[in-house]
Every structure is written in structure tokens, then in C-alpha cells.
């Protein structure tokens, strides 16, 4: 009788549940979705009992538990009975089962209708639907939802407890966030997470955070006043609103609105980007004990006028003080061994640099390039190197290597009438007199000079004729680029590598035309019969070349913008049939050229499509005349 009674009760209960499901379309739909999708979802994956992964579950990024053996379901469902649930769900023992780790209140009801009790119930925090989730990582936000939600919290963004990571650029450029509070559970804050949040004022870092990127997390947060860290955090700390590692040996990030900072004596490293774009920073005190200043640490600190580097400092990294407002004399202490690329680039108010006795490298190598640490310091007049430095020296304010065989850099504001390069110099470095407009008069190059570097005299003030000694074996094509007062380049007839004709620089056999000086004055220019290649920008802005241009019949290649802005060339230019390669814009802005007559019947394959870009001349193909 008891057995019969139990069977009747079970049948009646099943009938009631079935009736409820049929009469409740929401419940019925949920049940159907559960019964079908839970068996077929992602079945192509090879997964194991209890393995967790992030998937798109019912349209939401959720964590689910994969079960491939019904015997293990009791780990996830209380009161589990294998036969009862396998029959109810219509699943076989060898089929994968997907069961949500966490469910909402609504989902819990239909699971209860099926007689299934999840081992945990997840109730979302207010505002969770404002974020784009990847599992438990926030990867972005829904703009209108977040804006509406923050309007109810006075701009306070409280990161949900569920969140373990704030991903790359998650909240970049969000102007309506004013305060950020992280909660226990958050582990990682990725690069650029809050970059350019212009109205962000404060940030609270919870005790659970283990990693904060040093790549512009709070860059451009110009109104940020304070970064505070929970005192129980094991990895990070804060002092006066500045973020440090726990031991305060590394200064990680300063708030964008900071005006003064007394760096603790415990700090050995100013981290990269630490004060980057802190435009209100007027004073920073660096104490002995500091050993390195990271890349871009004080970049664009445009109010920072005075910096005293401590006597323990060893390295100044890339762009460390790029475009800072350092004024007057800069002393590099004896302890400093390395100054990397662009460290003081565009520090336009430095007037003098004193280099200590142990500096070994500038710009990361023994040579100086375009990213020279002191280039474009427009008011820099003098380098002074201590005599006991083994790697560098100075003379008349110019920086050399130790034995003065290489001229490294003239300060941007260096002044001289008639420039005499010392007889010891074998190499004039890249960009060495770049932009030195106060270097005027003639330049005298010594016999024994071997090489002249990239743009070494570009945009400088030297004038008249330049005489190249017989000893020179290397001249970069841009060495005299935009040196607008040079009238001629003459090469010693005994030089084995170069030659000149009509003030134009060629290789020795005149098969390559390298450069014509800006102030070259010629009427009706005819190029030599031997010429095969005209280098790029060779006649750039040579506006004193007037009349016609005659190209020789052996010419093969004209490189990019070769005759750029030669506005004095006029009439008709005939392109020989021998020309097989033409790069872009060779007659760009040559407003006087009216016709370009090409011997070729159509554009050769080796001619760029934009070969006559920004030239309004009429082009004729298949020209057979004189």
C-alpha cells in the first residue's frame, strides 16, 4: 500500500509540473531550451568533468561547468538522483552536460520547477549590465547604460565584486566617470584602462589587486587628484595620493593634477609613464637612493622648470623628460652611465648641459641619431664634459667623442660665424648641426674627414660654397638637405668617390646625381650624358634654377620628388625613352612646367601611378619630336 501511495504521489506531482509548464510559456520555453541546448551546446569540444570555461550562455557571457559523466552531477546538484534526472532531462550517460555555475533569481525558479537545485545562486550587483564582460573580466561598457547608471551614483564607478580584471582600454575616454572604487575580488588592471578620463578625480585600489599595468592606466586624467590603496594590499601602497609598490621602492603613477611631489628616500625607480602629462607639476624632489628614471616618466611636464638629478642616479630612459620645461643648466651627475633616446628632446629652455665623468652612452649607443637626447633643445648653447670622462669630450661648446675623431652634436643655439671643423675629426655625426640656424658663414672641412652623416647640416645657417676634401668616402644624400643658403658644392678633383659639376654633387663617374644646394643658380639646366640616377629630393626647392630642364638620353631612374618645388623651371620637359623607373611626385609643385612629353608610348610598368602627382602640366605620350 505504501509503495502504491508513493507512486500515485509521484504521478500526481509530475502531472502538476507538466500542467504548470504548459500553462506558463516562459517556464515552458526555459525548460525546452534547457533540455535541448544543455545537451548540444559546444559538443564539439573535448572537455572533462568539472572543467570551467567562459561561453555565450543564453546570450550572456557566463561561466558554466561541463559535466561528461552523470555520476558526477551530485557535485553540482544537491539531492541528485541519476535515473530521475537522466529521465527528466532526456540525456544519456555518455553525453556532455552543460550546467550554469551561477544563476539569477528568475533562472532559479525554472530550475526549481525541474527539481534541480544549483550549488550556488548569483545575484547581480546594481549596474552590472552596464559593462561588456568576458567571463569575469570587464572589456568595455555600454555608453548610454553606464551614463544613466552613473547619473544615479554622482559619477562614482564601483567595480562589481564579480570583476577580476579590468581589461585593456575598458574605460578609455569616458568623460563622465568622476570616482572609481574597486572591490575585493579584482586582481588585474590592464594598460590604458582609464586613459583620458578627463573628469576622473579619485581612484581607490582594493586590497585584492595584484597587478596594475605601467602603460598609461591613468594617462591624460588631468583632474585626477588622488590614487589611494587599501592598507591591507600586499602589492601596492600610496602616499599623498601617489601610487607605489608595497615597499615604496618604485613610484608607479602620480595623479594628473599633482603640483608638487617629494619622492620618498626609499624609491629606487621612477616607473615609466609615472608623471607623464602631469602638466601642473611644478616641483619634484628626487633624493639620493634613486637609481633609474623610466621611459616617459616626466614626458610633457610642461610646468616642471627645475630638476636636480641625485648623485645615485645611473640611468635616464627613453623620453624621460621629453618636452619638459627644464630651464637653465642641467647637470648630469657623475653616477649616470646611460642616457637613452630622446631623454631631453624638445626641452626648449635648457641652456647648458654639464656631463659627468661616468656617462658612457647617449641615446643607447656610442653614436647619436635623429632621436638624440638633446636634439631640438632650441635654447641650448653649450655642452661641457668633465675632463675625466673616458667616452666624451667638448670643445667650444660642441660635443665630441673622447679623442675628437667624431663630432657628435652641436647645441641647437650654438652661434658662430664661419665654422672650422677640427683637423682631428674623421666623422661628422647624423643631425650634428641639424637646425643650427645661428651657425653662419662658410664651413671649412678638414683634409682627413671621412664621412658626413644624415642631415648633418640640414636646415643650418651656413652659406656660400662647400668644399669636399679628397679624403671623404661617405656623404649621405640628405647631408645638406634644406641648407637653404649654400650656393655650390665643390669636390676636390682627387676624391675617389665623389665629383661635382656646376655646383651639384655627383658620385665619381657622374652616373648618380646626389644633391643640388638650395641656392644653386642656373639658367637652362642640362644634365650630363653619363647620368643614370637622380636621387630623391635632389633638387628640392631649388627655386633659382630657371628656364628649361634637359634630361639626358641615358637616364634610367628618377627617385621620389626629385624636382620638388622647382618653381623656376618652365616650358616643356622631355622624358627620354631610357627612363624605366620613376617614383612619386617628381615634379610636385613645379608650377612653371607646362608640358611633359614622354618618348614612351604609354606609362612604363616601372613608373609609379602618382609619378606626376601635384603637377598640372599636360602629359603627352609617344612624343617623337626634338
Say what each PLM segment does.
Residues 216, 370-372, 606-616:
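Short, aromatic/basic amphipathic alpha-helical patches
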Amino acid at each position: 500500500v505504501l509503495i502504491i501511495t508513493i507512486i500515485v504521489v509521484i504521478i500526481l506531482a509530475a502531472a502538476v509540473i507538466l500542467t504548470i509548464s504548459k500553462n506558463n510559456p516562459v517556464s515552458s520555453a526555459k525548460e525546452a531550451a534547457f533540455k535541448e541546448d544543455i545537451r548540444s551546446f559546444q559538443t564539439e569540444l573535448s572537455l572533462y568533468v568539472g572543467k570551467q570555461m567562459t561561453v555565450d550562455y543564453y546570450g550572456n557571457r557566463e561561466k558554466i561547468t561541463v559535466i561528461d559523466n552523470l555520476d558526477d552531477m551530485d557535485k553540482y546538484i544537491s539531492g541528485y538522483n541519476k535515473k530521475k534526472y537522466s529521465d527528466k532531462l532526456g540525456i544519456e550517460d555518455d553525453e556532455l552536460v552543460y550546467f550554469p555555475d551561477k544563476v539569477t533569481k528568475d533562472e532559479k525558479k525554472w530550475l526549481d520547477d525541474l527539481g534541480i537545485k544549483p550549488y550556488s545562486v548569483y545575484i547581480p550587483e546594481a549596474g552590472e549590465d552596464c559593462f561588456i564582460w568576458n567571463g569575469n573580466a570587464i572589456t568595455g561598457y555600454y555608453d548610454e547604460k553606464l551614463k544613466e547608471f552613473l547619473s544615479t551614483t554622482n559619477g562614482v564607478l564601483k567595480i562589481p565584486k564579480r570583476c577580476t580584471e579590468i581589461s585593456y582600454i575598458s574605460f578609455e575616454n569616458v568623460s563622465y566617470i568622476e570616482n572609481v572604487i574597486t572591490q575585493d575580488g579584482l586582481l588585474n588592471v590592464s594598460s590604458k584602462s582609464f586613459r583620458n578620463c578627463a573628469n576622473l578625480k579619485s581612484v581607490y585600489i582594493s586590497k585584492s589587486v595584484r597587478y596594475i599595468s605601467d602603460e598609461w592606466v591613468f594617462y591624460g586624467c588631468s583632474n585626477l587628484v588622488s590614487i589611494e590603496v587599501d592598507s591591507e594590499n600586499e602589492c601596492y601602497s600610496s602616499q599623498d595620493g601617489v601610487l607605489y609598490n608595497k615597499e615604496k621602492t618604485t613610484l608607479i603613477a602620480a595623479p594628473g593634477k599633482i603640483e608638487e611631489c617629494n619622492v620618498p628616500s626609499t624609491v629606487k625607480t621612477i616607473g615609466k609613464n609615472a608623471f607623464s602629462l602631469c602638466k601642473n607639476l611644478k616641483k619634484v624632489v628626487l633624493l639620493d637612493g634613486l637609481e633609474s628614471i623610466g621611459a616617459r616618466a616626466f614626458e610633457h611636464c610642461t610646468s616642471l622648470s627645475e630638476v636636480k638629478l641625485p648623485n645615485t642616479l645611473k640611468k635616464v630612459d627613453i623620453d624621460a623628460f621629453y618636452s619638459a620645461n627644464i630651464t637653465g643648466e642641467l647637470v648630469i651627475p657623475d653616477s649616470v652611465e646611460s642616457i637613452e633616446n630622446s631623454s631631453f628632446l624638445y626641452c626648449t629652455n635648457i641652456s647648458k648641459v654639464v656631463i659627468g665623468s661616468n656617462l658612457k652612452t647617449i641615446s643607447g649607443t656610442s653614436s647619436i641619431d635623429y632621436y638624440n637626447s638633446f636634439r631640438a633643445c632650441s635654447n641650448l648653447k653649450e655642452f661641457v664634459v668633465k675632463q675625466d670622462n673616458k667616452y666624451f669630450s667638448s670643445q667650444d661648446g660642441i660635443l665630441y667623442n673622447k679623442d675628437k675623431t667624431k663630432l657628435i652634436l652641436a647645441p641647437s643655439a650654438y652661434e658662430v660665424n664661419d665654422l672650422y671643423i677640427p683637423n682631428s675629426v674623421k666623422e661628422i655625426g647624423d643631425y650634428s648641426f641639424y637646425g643650427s640656424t645661428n651657425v653662419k658663414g662658410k664651413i671649412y672641412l678638414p683634409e682627413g674627414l671621412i664621412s658626413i652623416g644624415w642631415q648633418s647640416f640640414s636646415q643650418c645657417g651656413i652659406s656660400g660654397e662647400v668644399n669636399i676634401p679628397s679624403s671623404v668616402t661617405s656623404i649621405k644624400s640628405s647631408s645638406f638637405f634644406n641648407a637653404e643658403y649654400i650656393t655650390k658644392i665643390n669636390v676636390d678633383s682627387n676624391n675617389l668617390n665623389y665629383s661635382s659639376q656646376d655646383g651639384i654633387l655627383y658620385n665619381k663617374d657622374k652616373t648618380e646625381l646626389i644633391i643640388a644646394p638650395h641656392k644653386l643658380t642656373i639658367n637652362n639646366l642640362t644634365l650630363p650624358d653619363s647620368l643614370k640616377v637622380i636621387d630623391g629630393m635632389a633638387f628640392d626647392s631649388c627655386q633659382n634654377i630657371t628656364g628649361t630642364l634637359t634630361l639626358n638620353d641615358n637616364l634610367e631612374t628618377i627617385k621620389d620628388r626629385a624636382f620638388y618645388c622647382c618653381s623656376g623651371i618652365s616650358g616643356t620637359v622631355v622624358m627620354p625613352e631610357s627612363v624605366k623607373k620613376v617614383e612619386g611626385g617628381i615634379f610636385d609643385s613645379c608650377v612653371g612646367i607646362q608640358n611633359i612629353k614622354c618618348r614612351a608610348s604609354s606609362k612604363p610598368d616601372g613608373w609609379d601611378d602618382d609619378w606626376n602627382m601635384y603637377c598640372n602640366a599636360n602629359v603627352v605620350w609617344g612624343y617623337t619630336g626634338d
